[in-house]
Amino acid sequence: MKYPTVSFRWGVRRSHVCAWLLLLLCVGCATPSRTLFVSPVGNDTNPGTQNKPFATLPRAIEQVRELKRSEEPCGPVTVFLRGGTYELREPIIFTPADSGTSNAPVTYASFPGEHAILSGGKRLTVNWRPTPGKPYWQLDVPSARDGKWTFHSLIVNGESRMRARTPNWGEKVLRAEGREPGGDARQALRYYAGDVNPAWRNPTDIDVVLLCSWTPTIHRIKEIVPETRSIRFFSAHSRTVDAWEPHFRYYLSNVFEALDQPGEWYLDRPTGTLYYYPLPGEDLAKAEVVAPVMKSRMIEFAGDPGKGQFIAHLHLRDLSFRYVDGDMDRYNGVYRQGHMFLASALSAHGLRNASFERCEFTQLGEYALELADGCRDVTVRQCHIWDIGAGALQLGVTDLATLKANEPALAVRNLVIDNNCIHRLGTIWHGSYGIVNRFASQTQITHNEIFDTHWDAIGLDARWDWKGEKFSSGNVVAYNHLHHLGLRYHTDAAGVYQFGPLDTHIHHNLIHDTFAYPYICGFAGVYLDEQSRNAVVENNLVYNTDWYAYFQHKGMDNLFRNNIGAFARDGLIWRGGLNAAWTSNYLEACRNIYIASNDVAISQAWQPGLKPPVLHSNLYHTLAQSTPLTFAGKRFAEWQAQGQDANSVIADPGCRNPAAFDFSLRQDAPAIRAIGFAPFDDEIRKAGLTGDPAWRELPRKYTPRTPTATWTSDDLAKLVAFDLDFNLMKDGEAPGVFQSSEQTGAGFAVTSEIAGTHGPKCLK
């Protein structure tokens, strides 16, 4: 059987020597070590030897427990899984009984030179047939018709495919006319004529994806009402549908009539028919087509830290975890930042002194891995996490009240997330973090490369007040390479984003090419949101961002020092959210270099507040030599006259070739002597993956998705102007597209007192 995932080959080769050394070391241990074997062609009645292996992982886990319970001393235990696919139908659950010790750890790994896949999916038969008169093919899935099996993901030749949607990926999404007239403002929308067809097949299987500013929601259609051009949802949003924009964005997923692009598919549940539009050159008689059977979770590490029950010294290496579906029914309509209500395919509670190394996580419907309450001293290193329905990693505790009730047992500390390749995230849940560190302290997030995701690559989360900061402190985000983020779906985001943590150190990160939805906020390089306190942001390189390079919103006592920013839409840095309740919103920014491609050094004015921001000793430069730099619309001298940027200069910093994104400094660079800038050229080259060349070059094998097209203000004005239907409005309702001056007493509203040209109502 062919496994096309090139991402795993590096790990198998590199693990050969380590695994064989492990075998040799086991022979010489003072306490006898044990090695068990599992094979897809084994038998669970076998003794688990190399010649007579078990057939399933649960049987091997059971045998490890028996070894631990035996009276004879037991040394390290290694379970080798021979190459092939192991289909799971129930989650595997590890308990404290599966623990090892510091001298006798338990390890589950692929056999040296082979590739073991733990699969929550089922391979579909090759009995595909062409659909008459159509470019797609179809397959009977009787269990879908019987209601026994439904799935929201389809994988063909190792890559996930997209459910039929309108508009197609990359096209401008739809715009709503607004709320349903007289309807629930959280549970319905009014569509523009021609965008929705009430006669579509199986309309109650269609999902409406509302693209809010930073967190989208998914709503199953309850009914389409053509008389009012309304779509009503089964589930209500926690806010009004137009909370972010009057003509908010959305698209429709799982629409049979939208099956018009290669790579799209549709499952007709009532008839039990799966339709798929093959990519050019795909032969369904030979293709490996898999649909997930398992939902949300594949493996659980079920400690109970509140009762002092932990799983310890357990290691997973060189394994592949694939094909778990997202539970779109359970989470329909749920809203929360980062989709942190979602489950993870692998979920750990009370896991300690453990590791996941050189593993692959792919085609998983929600998050990939969660290290939750009570997890400590766990390492995730050199894993390839890609093609995921939501995000890669959830770290820490979600609920602050639960944590505070038993903090000594439940606190999450000392996690290491190092040297992982993470990309193509949010294929279902677009507003997901790449890595999110919730209530967890002393986490090290280093040397990861994260790209091709809709929202924040790395997030640190300790809530919107000061109550949680001590439970998320002392975290380090360093030497990460974060790029091609946003895809123009979302905004108010960043490569590194945090709200609430204390004493975070963010350094030596390379962040570039962010793409924001352009009409609400933007997509920064580093963003310190509310209650971020005592953070140090230094020695980072940020360029090509759709907002500021660096940004603070309602933070306190944070330092931005010795960073480089370049070619940001709105300049080097800004402090937002200053108001009467946030007069302590304070930062210091010094010894930073900013290189513009336009005339904007800083785009907005800085209000003083109780503690004014301290900008000093910065260097500004623009490649647009014919246009002077502006600071909140002012010239540099005026800006400094307001007390800003003392000892700062406008000068060429001495970068070798900034137009080609080479920001390394010459030895005689003016920035060194003018502002005391400390070059970090050698260190920033270390950002991203480390190790052998094949691993470091892995990201270059994957092309990020193209950012989606966006509506221009002219596009939207034309849409609104030419689609006003007063007959769908109530008497007295004022169309949102018009404005009037209350000072002059002017006003307008829909009325039925005077007949309109095309119906009983008009505008008065």
Regions found by a protein language model. Give the residues of each.
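Bulky hydrophobic/aromatic "packing anchor" residues in well-ordered structure
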Residues: V38, Y108, L118, L393, ...
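Glycine- and acidic/polar-rich repeat regions and solenoidal domains
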Residues: P91-I93, T101, I299, G326-A348, ...
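N-terminal secretory signal peptides that target proteins for export/translocation
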Residues: M1-R13
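Bacterial Sec-dependent signal peptides at the C-terminal "C-region" and cleavage site
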Residues: V27-T35
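Short polar catalytic/cofactor-binding loops
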Residues: P40-D44, D725-A734
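Extracellular polysaccharide-degrading/modifying enzymes targeting complex plant/algal/animal polysaccharides
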Residues: F37-E360, A401-E407, A641-A651, F661-K718
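Bacterial N-terminal signal peptides
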Residues: H16-G28
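Extracellular glycan-recognition surfaces and repeat-rich motifs
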Residues: M729-L763
